[in-house]
Swiss-Prot record:
Keywords: Electron transport, Heme, Iron, Membrane, Metal-binding, Mitochondrion, Mitochondrion inner membrane, Respiratory chain, Transmembrane, Transmembrane helix, Transport, Ubiquinone. The gene is MT-CYB. Gene3D superfamilies: Cytochrome Bc1 Complex, Chain C (1.20.810.10). It is found in: Mitochondrion inner membrane. It comes from Perognathus alticolus. Belongs to the cytochrome b family. This is Cytochrome b. Component of the ubiquinol-cytochrome c reductase complex (complex III or cytochrome b-c1 complex) that is part of the mitochondrial respiratory chain. The b-c1 complex mediates electron transfer from ubiquinol to cytochrome c. Contributes to the generation of a proton gradient across the mitochondrial membrane that is then used for ATP synthesis. The keyword Iron applies. A ubiquinone binds at H201. InterPro entries: Cyt_b/b6_C (IPR005798), Cyt_b/b6_C_sf (IPR036150), Cyt_b/b6_N (IPR005797), Cytb/b6-like_sf (IPR027387), Cytochrome_b (IPR030689), Cytochrome_b_C_euk/bac (IPR048260), Cytochrome_b_N_euk/bac (IPR048259), Di-haem_cyt_TM (IPR016174).
Amino acid sequence: MTIMRKSHPLMKMVNHAFIDLPAPSNISSWWNFGSLLGVCLMIQIMTGLFLSMHYTSDTLTAFSSVTHICRDVNYGWLIRYMHANGASLFFICLYFHIGRGIYYGSYLYKETWNIGIILLFLVMATAFMGYVLPWGQMSFWGATVITNLLSAIPYIGSDLVEWIWGGFSVDKATLNRFFAFHFILPFIIAAMAMVHLLFLHETGSNNPLGIPSDSDKIPFHPYYSFKDLLGVLILFAFFFTIVLFFPDALGDPDNYSPANPLNTPPHIKPEWYFLFAYAILRSIPNKLGGVIALALSILVLALFPLLHTSNQRSMTFRPISQVMFWILVSDLLILTWIGGQPVEPPFIIIGQAASILYFSIILLLLPIAGLIENKLLKW
């Protein structure tokens, strides 16, 4: 008789995805971030659900309701800080996951990669709308500045902004709809993650050598299920250290002041995980140009499969590409730092140089490095 997990229609799907899935025998800890992202999403959905039971999406009471959660709800402070820092953790894992994909050439699984880019946009939209909900100073002004960027779109721009606002400024209608979207989007993200996995399991996982691994596969369970579990435990240790000891380290002090449309904060900036894109936006002294650069800073990821010139998939044995990759990582860290600085010399020129370098490495230097390496290896 066949075992139930192999015959039952529902369990069969779980079995094929998480138990009997043939996986390469040599995938490293960089492959743990996919499962960690799943854990992050579950943390966010669960903490978000409990927060929504006590939160009110009204401009008069939103800020007070968040204070009430922290002061009066049993373990409300813990749920709130888990949710706020869970977003940061989500993006840390997300950026590591994308970096792994770039380094090891995983982007050559085009469908999986493109669904991943859509997922990135959805997560960014969700995080942005979530940041508006506490209705602090940075919530209000961040929402005003970022939504206002759409007014740079020719002809329909200003109408589009008013349509998103639901009025003539960021107000009650905006807060209400942002709450609705912020609640529904994580479930759409979960569904898209399933599609992401579906496409991945069509091809099987890549591996650090970037070579076909069909000749040497091992079952996902128990090998990688326990490896993922260890990753989750390390993640939790890191997560709860931040939540319990440094809960406000990644937040903005301005968001502890209630939103005031009559008082502009000296430096309007988004959360740390958007600062690199914000720096690219600010480095162009033209509104429409900045918005285009902002969109391209993420959309440029879609070009990776087209710009792959090397005859090897992974960067494991490609030293020139490795140097380019780590310069790109350093450049992103510099952009993140610049995004949090005021718009004044020398930060302006550093931001512009870092933005040019960002696009140059991806569009020009990495493909050239691939061609040089082919030549050196006489391929």
